[in-house]
C-alpha cells in the first residue's frame, strides 16, 4: 500500500527502534521502523516530527511498516523559526488528541497551516481551529451571535449562547469571533490566559461532538 502522511510525533522504541504517530491517507496510524534511531540507516531523519512523507508500506499487528520512502518534504526545517514551531506543535497536539479518521479537506487544511509563515502562532492556531470546526461541520453558532455581559453560557451541542451550559468569559468569545471575522487576524494580541482558556473551550466543544 501507498500513502501520504504527516509525522506528528516520534518516540524511541527500545534502544534503537523508532515508533512514530502519523496522520494521512490511512487516518491516524502508528509506524514502526526497526533500528530507525541508528544514524547510519538510510531512513534516519526521515520521520522527524512535521515532515510530510509518501511511503510504500504494509500493516502488521496494528502498526504500519515502511517498505520504502517514495518522497519526503522536510517541513521540520520550518520549525527552526520558533513561531512556526509553536504553531505546528499546537496543530499536531490537536490532531493527536482528537482526529483519528482521514478527511481530504481536513488534511489540506492542516497542510496549509503547517506551511504558513506566522508572526502570531496563538492567533493562527485559533484561526486553524475555527476552520477545523467548520470543515467537520461543527462551526459554533456563537460566532454569529451578539455576546454581551461579563460572562456567557455556551451550549456545547450547538455552540450557541444559552441560559445554561459551560461558563465562558464574554471577552474570550468576542476574541474568537474577531479572529474568525478578520483577514488580518494576526494583529490581534493574545494573552496567555486567553490562549489557554480559548484552547480549552474549543477542545471541549470538539470533543463533545466527536464523542457523541
Swiss-Prot record:
GO biological process: DNA recombination; double-strand break repair
Pfam families in alphabetical order: RecO_C (PF02565)
Protein name: Uncharacterized protein aq_2203
GO terms under cellular component: bacterial nucleoid
Organism: Aquifex aeolicus (strain VF5)
Amino acid at each position: 500500500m501507498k500513502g501520504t502522511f504527516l509525522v506528528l510525533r516520534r518516540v524511541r522504541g527500545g534502544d534503537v527502534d523508532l515508533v512514530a504517530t502519523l496522520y494521512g491517507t490511512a487516518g491516524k496510524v502508528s509506524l514502526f521502523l526497526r533500528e530507525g534511531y541508528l544514524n547510519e540507516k538510510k531512513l534516519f531523519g526521515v520521520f522527524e516530527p512535521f515532515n510530510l512523507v509518501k511511503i510504500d508500506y504494509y500493516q502488521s499487528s496494528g502498526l504500519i511498516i515502511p517498505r520504502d520512502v517514495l518522497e519526503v518534504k522536510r517541513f521540520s526545517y520550518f520549525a527552526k523559526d520558533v513561531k512556526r514551531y509553536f504553531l505546528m506543535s499546537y496543530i499536531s497536539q490537536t490532531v493527536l488528541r482528537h482526529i483519528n479518521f482521514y478527511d481530504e479537506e481536513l488534511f489540506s487544511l492542516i497542510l496549509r497551516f503547517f506551511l504558513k509563515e506566522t508572526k502570531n502562532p496563538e492567533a493562527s492556531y485559533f484561526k486553524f481551529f475555527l476552520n477545523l470546526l467548520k470543515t467537520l461541520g461543527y462551526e459554533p453558532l456563537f460566532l454569529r451571535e451578539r455576546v454581551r455581559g461579563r460572562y456567557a453560557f455556551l451550549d456545547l451541542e450547538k455552540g450557541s449562547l444559552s441560559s445554561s451550559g459551560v461558563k465562558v468569559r464574554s471577552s474570550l468569545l468576542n476574541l474568537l469571533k474577531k479572529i474568525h471575522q478578520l483577514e488580518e487576524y494576526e494583529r490581534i494580541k493574545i494573552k496567555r490566559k486567553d490562549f489557554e482558556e480559548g484552547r480549552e473551550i474549543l477542545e471541549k466543544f470538539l470533543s463533545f461532538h466527536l464523542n457523541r
